[in-house]
């Protein structure tokens, strides 16, 4: 594996996640619409959010921060699995790098823009709306104060309140009698953090992926967040949250139900902080399929693995894991964790094991010599339920050392509870199945 000495690679080239539910009828006539994705460290987001005090991107502290952030995602999943009513949602803002990916969205008529955090672990797309205590401005890194748009149904001519008797409202939501509108409350994992408001129908402005590009006003349902509490008052989600989960209130599901797209989306994470999310992406012709495990009360993107192959070592072992593009690394409990890391370590013969005086998030790291420009690691592939194999394209991360030189680490973290496949994996979800294919491009836009 070759690496340029003047770069810090987060996951080598491009990381992609495809997520979709394809309806039984033909989707050939459906369109594909997209939005740009911006990393927390990208120039676009840095214009809004101060990165002073954040760990240097690609450093060991940076990966430690992402791992800490992932632990919060895992805690959310455990709380959701144990819940018998409404799921506990993902947001927990105590860690500075928790929100790593954002998108600038345009909503309403006339259109206003909002910088929203992306989350595959929650469903509702909500914006601060007609609120007295929400965040209205930010101090940018340029020392300028930036005003944020606050959504209001009364100023958007295309808006319409969702009535209490609407099918969108459902039995799990309340009713605002004063407004005669469907009420909602989303409670997040962070202490006393929630958003409460009403549901509104409006338009989301999207661009097609065709050339020349066409602009489309896509009808959606969003949360008008009247009351924000906890970390949302500290600007943790800045200007709203864009849920990408499975529920029918999520934007991918709404676009499909309106007949605008196949019920799918792909997320491409580029190495330069700029990526792309495409709604209606149907993947590649050569992709392979594995069925989802949908027995949970609150379904997630959960699959079964039946075999692990690390280089020449093959182990028959069945376990389940959830795909989550919002999680940075892969977390496995035993015996799957030990099978992979011990087999990987036994086949690394050219580089010495890295021994740190303090505990690092990765247990298996190796030191590269000052003159070394490449390294070779054993191939890792997983056999999924149904028999198809998935080849992991980037099992390691490259980390610069403070005193000079590099180490590379197997980017698998030991879990004491659930298994999660992080965003170094590429999947597409189709007809209640996950589809996966090799990543062959580094260009997200």
List the predicted regions and their residue ranges.
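Zymogen propeptides
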Residues: 2-220, 228-234, 252, 256-257, ...
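Active-site beta-strand/loop microenvironment that shapes enzyme catalytic pockets
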Residues: 113-124, 311-344
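Short, solvent-exposed loop/turn segments enriched in Ser/Thr/Gly
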Residues: 197-201, 238, 317, 375-376
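C-terminal reverse transcriptase regions that engage the nucleic-acid substrate
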Residues: 243-245
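Extended C-terminal subregions enriched in glycine
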Residues: 353-387
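C-terminal transmembrane module of eukaryotic multi-pass membrane proteins
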Residues: 375-405, 410-428
């Amino acid at each position: 594996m070759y690496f340029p000495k003047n770069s810090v690679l987060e996951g080598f080239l491009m990381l992609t996640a495809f997520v979709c539910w394809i309806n039984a009828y033909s989707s050939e006539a459906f369109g594909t619409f997209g939005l740009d994705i911006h990393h927390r460290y990208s120039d676009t987001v840095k214009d809004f959010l101060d990165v002073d005090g954040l760990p240097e991107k690609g450093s060991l502290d940076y990966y430690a921060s992402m791992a800490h952030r992932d632990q919060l995602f895992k805690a959310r999943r455990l709380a959701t699995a144990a819940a018998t009513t409404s799921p506990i949602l993902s947001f927990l803002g105590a860690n500075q790098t928790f929100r790593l990916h954002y998108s600038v969205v345009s909503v309403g008529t006339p259109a206003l823009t909002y910088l929203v955090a992306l989350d595959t672990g929650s469903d509702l797309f909500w914006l601060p709306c007609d609120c007295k205590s929400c965040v209205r401005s930010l101090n940018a890194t340029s020392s300028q104060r930036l005003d944020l748009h606050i959504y209001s149904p009364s100023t958007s001519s295309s808006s319409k309140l969702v009535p209490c008797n609407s099918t969108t409202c459902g039995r799990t939501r309340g009713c605002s009698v004063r407004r005669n509108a469907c009420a909602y409350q989303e409670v997040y994992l962070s202490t006393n953090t929630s958003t409460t408001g009403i549901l509104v129908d409006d338009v989301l402005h999207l661009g097609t992926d065709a050339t020349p590009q066409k602009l489309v006003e896509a009808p959606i349902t969003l949360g008008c967040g009247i009351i924000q509490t906890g970390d949302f008052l500290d600007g943790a989600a800045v200007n709203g949250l864009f849920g990408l989960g499975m529920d029918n209130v999520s934007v991918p599901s709404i676009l499909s139900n309106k007949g605008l797209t196949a019920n799918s989306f792909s997320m491409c994470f580029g190495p330069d902080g700029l990526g792309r999310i495409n709604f209606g992406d149907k993947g590649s012709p050569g992709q392979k399929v594995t069925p989802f495990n949908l027995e949970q009360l609150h379904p997630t993107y959960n699959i079964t693995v039946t075999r692990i192959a690390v280089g020449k070592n093959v182990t028959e072992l069945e376990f389940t894991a959830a795909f989550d593009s919002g999680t940075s690394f892969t977390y496995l409990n035993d015996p799957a964790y030990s099978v992979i890391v011990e087999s990987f370590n036994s086949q690394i013969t050219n580089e010495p094991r890295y021994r740190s005086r303090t505990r690092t998030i990765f247990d298996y790291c190796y030191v590269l010599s000052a003159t070394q420009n490449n390294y070779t690691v054993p191939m890792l592939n997983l056999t999924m339920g149904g028999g198809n194999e998935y080849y992991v394209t980037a099992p390691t991360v490259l980390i610069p050392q403070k005193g000079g030189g590099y180490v590379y680490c197997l980017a698998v973290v030991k879990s004491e509870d659930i298994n999660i496949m992080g965003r170094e994996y590429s999947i597409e979800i189709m007809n209640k199945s996950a589809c996966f294919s090799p990543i062959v491009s580094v260009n997200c836009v």
